């Protein structure tokens, strides 16, 4: 009987060692999951050892970085070699100089104290962005001088052609103000109030978008809506404009296309930028928006569509601060809340209660006659008398 139990114990012990599974997961570059547009010339790699056993420690690692998924010899830009280290967070890239607007693939092998054989991660990737200021070939674009102080929101457009087969297309864009970009009638990305607030005098963040699937063979159009945002503002209690960071809003963009024949170019001709005005009469972080839906033009960013009263755009002053890639989470729509209660105040105002404090905007349908003015105001609480 004792021999039977001993044999059973040995068998189970052997099974637990051979069945031990080690996975290398959660690959990150600069603590980001497959970032698109990263501007760091010396990024840092991180990974996690995933196992259901205790006391599994990394003893060595080996990182590979290449410009193709198969890590061919010609595409390899870094092989760290087998490094004796427990480090698995912020491992420095020490390979060849990284190129701008280029996709890189990477994987890591890990050795542990529990096995002489290595475990290898799946292949991950990241896309470099505009690594230096000189990669921004375009100038900043703005309205002409006579429209500089207008609170209306300009709609900029630029037409261009794509006649060769492309393998990638990336838009890099930022603004002094807030922007919303479109290509061929479709909104680019889902972030709100881009590029987000920073100390504009010192630093502005740019965003990068993969727009390859949005482009057409032949005629194309890029469109940019530009609002004051945090950059400058009009105050309701002041007749003059309050300049927070500058007198004039502007934006800069690079649409970089890589072709199947090996060419890469920034496709937008800045001399082709023009603008007109649409339904947004004013837009302010502090005072909300005024919109005239009679002026809505849903085809303004469609290729070939002629926008009325277009004006030639102007090149704005260069930005003296630092432009870097957005690393923080952007403002996005997270959920849709329905109204919970309609409250009639003692003075007869209609208050719609959503049941919780929130940041967002209102969507509603109306059968009111054309020309009716609707005013929506927002607040957190009613006063002691129940008034808005």
Model-based region annotation:
Residues 1-23:
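Bacterial Sec-dependent N-terminal signal peptides
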Residues 22-388:
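Extracellular/oxidizing-compartment recognition motifs
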